[in-house]
């Protein structure tokens, strides 16, 4: 009895008896200790380890070791699959979700056909069956393209803060925005080069056509401007011309008709300097005749009339044509050209010359 009592009291109070109880079930204790350590280190706060009383069977009151052994085994075997499979953290879930999205996007892009186009229009062959991993082309939405085009209109090159801001605004990555702007700059460069080449090839014929159509109008405008300039000069020096013509009429009786005809030409050369392109012969003849008529009417003397008649005989239309044929064949060709003077233009010149004569009659 005493031995049993000592044994019982020693079993309850003494530490060696507790050590004996702990070492009496070595496989069970090792299994529970290792599993609880693994589960606590792997799961940190997600998995709660079993209580201390369950790990040590001798401290659990009213439980026999034999009865507790089958209870401990299933509890010990539960953390083992958790230890073999690591728990899922939020960053792991995001990674798996992105992988799933990539696989679904690849399936969606490869199903319609083996070739698909980017927003810029360049095709790319998709690797449907091959295992090679190629970077997928970004399919931009209409709103994203609109905002990117708007930004490109104002800024061809983006600074990094603005690029980050646009990427966050349009739900794109910074790399996608950078690559889009690179491609858009190259597209803009190609478009400008094509436009320059097109305009460079198309400019000469357009200028020739415009020149061919506007030759007649420009010629008449030049002649009208020159006539007006000559009028201004003649109005500035009316009295000098009258004195010159009077002297010429006095010298006409003493000298030959040729000298009388040469002197008005000298005065008319001043007015002919204003004509940059005196290609047609008819305006030249009319301008040479008109000042002579004006001088004759201003003087009113019969000698001046004789000189003017001689000028008319010398510088008739036929003589002008013969002179032009003798000087240059291009002038005769210009008369036969379709840009030649019409009756309306001739009437216009005659009317202007008559107005010139009427103005000088007042003096």
UniProtKB/Swiss-Prot annotation:
Gene Ontology MF annotations: DNA-binding transcription factor activity, RNA polymerase II-specific; RNA polymerase II cis-regulatory region sequence-specific DNA binding
Keywords from the named record: Developmental protein, DNA-binding, Homeobox, Nucleus, Transcription, Transcription regulation
InterPro entries cross-referenced by the UniProt entry: HD, HD_metazoa, Homeobox_Antennapedia_CS, Homeobox_CS, Homeodomain-like_sf
Biased composition (Polar residues): 100-109, 252-266
GO cellular component terms attached to this protein's record: nucleus
Main function: Sequence-specific transcription factor which is part of a developmental regulatory system that provides cells with specific positional identities on the anterior-posterior axis.
Name of the protein described by the UniProt record: Homeobox protein Hox-A2b
Species the sequence originates in: Danio rerio (Zebrafish)
Organism placement in taxonomy: Eukaryota, Metazoa, Chordata, Craniata, Vertebrata
């Amino acid at each position: 009895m005493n031995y049993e009592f000592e044994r019982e009291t020693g079993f309850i109070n003494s530490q060696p008896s507790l050590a004996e109880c702990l070492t009496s079930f070595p496989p069970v204790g090792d299994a529970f200790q290792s599993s609880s350590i693994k589960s606590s280190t792997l799961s940190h706060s997600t998995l709660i380890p079993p209580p201390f009383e369950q790990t040590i069977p001798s401290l659990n009151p009213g439980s026999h070791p034999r009865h507790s052994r089958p209870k401990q085994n299933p509890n010990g075997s539960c953390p083992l699959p958790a230890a073999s499979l690591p728990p899922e953290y939020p960053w792991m879930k995001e990674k798996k979700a992105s992988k799933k999205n990539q696989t679904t996007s690849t399936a969606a892009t490869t199903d319609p056909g083996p070739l698909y186009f980017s927003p810029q229009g360049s095709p790319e062959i998709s690797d449907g069956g091959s295992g090679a991993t190629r970077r997928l082309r970004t399919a931009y939405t209409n709103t994203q393209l609109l905002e990117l085009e708007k930004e490109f209109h104002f800024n061809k090159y983006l600074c990094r803060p603005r690029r980050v801001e646009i990427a966050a605004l349009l739900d794109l990555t910074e790399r996608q925005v950078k690559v889009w702007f690179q491609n858009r700059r190259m597209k803009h460069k190609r478009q400008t080069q094509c436009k320059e080449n097109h305009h460079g090839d198309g400019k000469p014929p357009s200028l020739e056509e415009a020149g061919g159509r506007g030759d007649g109008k420009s010629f008449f405008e030049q002649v009208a401007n020159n006539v007006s300039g000559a009028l201004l000069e003649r109005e500035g020096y009316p009295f000098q011309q009258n004195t010159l013509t009077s002297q010429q009429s006095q010298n006409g009786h003493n000298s030959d008709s040729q000298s009388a005809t040469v002197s008005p030409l000298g005065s008319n050369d001043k007015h002919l300097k204003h004509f940059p392109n005196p290609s047609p012969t008819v305006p030249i003849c009319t301008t040479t005749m008109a000042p002579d008529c004006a001088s004759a009417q201003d003087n009113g003397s019969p000698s001046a009339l004789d000189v003017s008649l001689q000028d008319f005989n010398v510088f008739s239309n036929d003589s002008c044509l013969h002179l032009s044929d003798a000087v240059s064949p291009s002038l005769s060709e210009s008369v036969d050209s379709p840009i030649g003077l019409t009756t309306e233009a001739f009437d216009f010149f005659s009317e202007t010359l008559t107005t010139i004569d009427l103005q000088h009659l007042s003096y």
